[in-house]
Structure formats: structure tokens, C-alpha cells
Amino acid sequence: MSSSLGKEKDSKEKDPKVPSAKEREKEAKASGGFGKESKEKEPKTKGKDAKDGKKDSSAAQPGVAFSVDNTIKRPNPAPGTRKKSSNAEVIKELNKCREENSMRLDLSKRSIHILPSSIKELTQLTELYLYSNKLQSLPAEVGCLVNLMTLALSENSLTSLPDSLDNLKKLRMLDLRHNKLREIPSVVYRLDSLTTLYLRFNRITTVEKDIKNLSKLSMLSIRENKIKQLPAEIGELCNLITLDVAHNQLEHLPKEIGNCTQITNLDLQHNELLDLPDTIGNLSSLSRLGLRYNRLSAIPRSLAKCSALEELNLENNNISTLPESLLSSLVKLNSLTLARNCFQLYPVGGPSQFSTIYSLNMEHNRINKIPFGIFSRAKVLSKLNMKDNQLTSLPLDFGTWTSMVELNLATNQLTKIPEDVSGLVSLEVLILSNNLLKKLPHGLGNLRKLRELDLEENKLESLPNEIAYLKDLQKLVLTNNQLTTLPRGIGHLTNLTHLGLGENLLTHLPEEIGTLENLEELYLNDNPNLHSLPFELALCSKLSIMSIENCPLSHLPPQIVAGGPSFIIQFLKMQGPYRAMV
């Protein structure tokens, strides 16, 4: 029950145009980072007849899995399911487009198997959208569309492209995602005006040397294929800003990657990388580097020269240490993910290395101590995830972490929380589940901004009265402790929507629970000594989920208990002083 530590608006413009490289980079950055896997959204096109379509949402933890494919613009059909168009209907659309001299044609989601050859007559087209059909091939006549700048062919069953496409000298954006390509069609290498090329989710095994011909490319996405190596010629793509090769089978990168000095976003997550070339330090514009889920055991010192780096994700590798002073050299770094590695100690480099860090994720390592003063210069550190380490205590300057907003210390071996937790006045999320806590400090009541407090699976026997001061608290998880009672002050937590009290030793609930007017979920399961419920529970008008499994509740008729939460609430209303509410 822990919280994670760590919408684009559709635009409508009169004149449809392909987004510039700078715009795509900006949109890619806004779409998320490298920490979470994301599902690609339905691309959108600009145009006065564009309508809102469905969007897929993703899964981060801090630092978030960056997917550059989210930035394509293409038209959305009216809400509903895939259209089934007859050949006559498609021809009708083509005729209409010709008569109106339209520059943009959307035939997406029509279940088209074969594109009519009369498409060749639409030579005025600059944008053609054929995504989400059933095309296995394109007619050669598409090569007659010499003014085409955008061609969207994703989500079909294409295995090749006609050579006639090399007539498309103005083509800037080509989208071939989610097809059945086993190689990059040779004609693609001849489309030397391309600035954006999407090849995600095919069956491609190699990238040919001819990739060097696409020297104008600013965005190349070949993620989710079966590519084992990149050619040295990748280094000739000097205008490349975003390179997405995630989810392939790369073991090494060519040293020539260092020639792509304009790259700002480099996504290499989910490969088999064993090392990185020293030339990666030449990427002076690099702002986001995704390396999660590889086989790296070391990071080159040269990475320190990437002074523009803002986000670095190294989750799930075999790294036990970083080059000394690496982090302090990365003066713009704000998000660092080192989760699921082999760290036993904090990175060497002193307090200055965290001075710009906003989010630090060290989850699932072997760290047993947070050094005193390590965050003394971390004035903007807001999110710290130390879940699943071997901490037995917290540093003496713990109370000075005043900028902390989300703190996850779950699954450690903490036996107490220092009283000066009261200094963490900005804290909104505090996760302390699965530790060895027997009591809580009174200073906890000073965390007036706290929205979520998770204390599941500890050894708590009571709660301090000061918990009543946490009036912004929305989620309180106390499952699997040794509580016998709750303080009456619990009734002051009027913003509480979720209260987890299962697997304790509660004998009763205080009548003040009836003041929790926003409570929606109440978990009381597995309290073997809980024989009754207060009539005041009937006042919790928003309560929609109540778990009472394995509670004796002997003071209630068995048939009422068997009926579940709604029967119980109704019974409490009928039998208690609040029957007038029925």
C-alpha cells in the first residue's frame, strides 16, 4: 500500500503542419521521463476538424519511462469503434478530397485491406493518415504524391514498402510503428528529407549503414524491435535530437555515438548493455539518459562532461559505485534513479552532489546507513525513496530535511522515528510500512501537510494523540499492527477517505469515527477481538467499501453480518439513535 515516489491538450489550428524538431523535443520532455513504462497515446493531427480521441495512460516511480513516440500528431476519428469501409466508400473519400483540393486526407481506422490506385490523383496532398487499417502493402501509386510531407502508416500489417516512395522528396515524417517489418525497407534510406522516423514495435533485426543518408533526422525511434547492434554510421546523424532504441538487444554502443552532439534525449532502457563508450561524454546537449534494465556494472567517468544532463535513470543494473564526483559535476541534474542495483553505500562525492537533485530513488539496494550531512546542501530535494534497503536508524540531522515532500522508508529495519521528524514541515507522503516500529513520535503531529501516512506491517500498539493534528490526511494505513484501541482524536481527520485497520487487535472503534464525513473505504478485517461497531458509523455517508472479514461482530445478528457492509450500515441506522436518517 505504498505510494509511488516519483494531459497533453489536443490543439486545434487552422493550418495543419508537421511539428518542428524543437516542438517535438519539447512535447517529448513534457510527456514524461524514463522511470515508468508508458503506453503510447493515440497520435493527433492539427486541423480544424480534429476531434478529441482516446488516450492511453502509463505506469514511473520517480523518473518516469520516456517514450518519444507520444509526440506524433495525427487526426482522431469521432469517438467510437473502428469504421468498416467498403472500397466504394474509400473511393468516395478520395473523390471528395480531389474535388475539395484538400491537402490532408484521413483514412485511419477504416479496416482498409487495399488502398485504391486512384490515390495517385491526389498530388496536392501534404498529409496522409492510414494508421489502424489492415494494409499488408501499399500500391506503387502512393509514390505519385510528390508533395507529401507526413505519411502515417502505423498499426497495419506492412512487411515492405514500394520503391516508388523514393519520389517523395518532401517527406519529413514517416510513421511505421506497429507493423510487421523484418527490416527497414531500403526505400526508407533514400528519403533524405526525413526529419522524423518512427519504427517502433516491428521485427527489425538490423540497422543498415545506409542510415547515414538520413542526415536531416532529428528524431529516430526504433524501440521494441530485435536490434542487436547499431552501425558506426549512426554517428553521421549530426542533427539527431532524440534517439530511442529502448527494448532491443544491444550489448554495446558504437563509439561514433559521441558524434551526435545535438542529442538531448537518449533512451537505451531494456537492452543488454554491458558497457558505455567513453565518447558518451561528448554529448554536451544530453539532458535525459535512460539506462534502466541493462547489464551495466560501471559508468564511464566521461559522463561527468555531460553538464546539461537533467535526468539519469540507472535502475536495475549491476552497479555498486559511481565515479567519484560524477554527480557533483552534473550541475543540472534534478532526477536520479539508482534503484535495484548493488549499492551498499551512498555515492562518494559529498553533500554538493545532491545540491540540484529534486528526486532521488535508491530503492532496493543494500544501504544500511544514510550519512550524516549528506543532504545538507540538498535544498530542493523533495522526493526520496529508500524503500527496501537495510536501514536500522536515521541520521541525526533527519529533522533538517525541510524541503522533503515524499519520503519512502518502507521495508527497512527501523525501530524508531526520531522526534525531530517534526522538522519535515513540507512532508505530504510518508511511507514507513514493513519496519519494526513499536511507537510513533509525538512530533508527527507537526506534519500538518501530510496527506498519506502508511504504517502497515509494524509492531505499533498505540497511536499518539497528536495524530489528531493531521487534518489534511486523506489516507491512513495501519494494517497488520498490534493496535487495541484508537485515540478519540481520530475523529478530527475529517478529510480521511481511506482508513486501513485490518489485522490488528482492536476491541472497539471510538464513536468519534462518525465524524469522518469523507470516509469512503474502511478496512476492519482480521480483528479477532472486534465484537461490535459503533452506531455512529452510520454517519459516514460516503462509506462505500467496508471490509469485515474474520471479525466476530457477535453483537450484530449473523444474518446482518452475512449481508455485508451495506446491511451493517443499514442495521446501525435502524437500531441506533440515527434511525431518522433512514
UniProtKB/Swiss-Prot annotation:
LRR repeats lie at residues 101-122, 124-145, 147-169, 170-191, 193-214, 216-237, 239-260, 262-283, 285-307, 308-329, 332-353, 356-377, 380-400, 403-424, 426-448, 449-470, 472-494, 495-516, 518-540, 542-563. It is found in: Cytoplasm; Nucleus. It holds the Pfam family LRR_8. One of its GO terms (molecular function) is protein phosphatase regulator activity. It is linked to Noonan syndrome-like disorder with loose anagen hair 1: A syndrome characterized by Noonan dysmorphic features such as macrocephaly, high forehead, hypertelorism, palpebral ptosis, low-set and posteriorly rotated ears, short and webbed neck, pectus anomalies, in association with pluckable, sparse, thin and slow-growing hair. Contains a N-terminal RVxF motif that is important for interaction with PP1c. PP1c (all isoforms) binds to the concave side of SHOC2, via LRR 2-5, 8-11, and 13-18. M-Ras/MRAS binds to the concave side of SHOC2, via LRR 1-10, 12 and 14-16. This is Leucine-rich repeat protein SHOC-2. It comes from Homo sapiens (Human).
